[in-house]
Design a protein with these regions (language model features):
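Short, surface-exposed interaction loops/tails
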Residues: 8-16, 27-30, 36, 47, ...
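N-terminal single-pass transmembrane signal-anchor helix
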Residues: 1-6
């Protein structure tokens, strides 16, 4: 009966990684907003934290070294999703879960910054 315990611990570790990544990305987005008086647009996405956007709205005071070194992937190898004017807050940053599609339950459930 070791398998259920190990799988439960793995699920917990994956969820903890998502939450840690989301907290880091949310903090970087807040710093971007402080510097530029707005969040990146949905089109600019999280990439605006790594590389200065070249499309409107252009950032006013983008940090030369960016806001994060690189964008993390969720534990299932999928990029985190970003939506300005989110459904849950000013911005939504989230993982689509193990299945990589919106919605789902258990390991397939979306995990977002609204759960922080």
């Amino acid at each position: 009966m070791v398998a259920p315990s190990v799988l439960g611990n793995q699920d917990k570790a994956m969820r903890q990684k998502v939450m840690a990544d989301l907290a880091t990305l949310e903090q970087a987005l807040d710093m971007y907003r402080l510097d530029n008086l707005r969040f990146p647009s949905s089109e600019q996405g999280l990439a605006a934290l790594v590389k200065k956007p070249t499309q409107e709205p252009l950032p006013r005071s983008w940090r030369s070294d960016g806001y994060v070194r690189r964008l993390p992937e969720d534990p299932w190898g999928t990029p985190y999703q970003y939506r300005m004017l989110g459904e849950h807050g000013r911005v939504d940053v989230y993982s689509l879960g193990a299945d990589g599609v919106p919605g789902g339950e258990g390991q397939d459930a979306d995990l977002g910054n609204w759960a922080l």
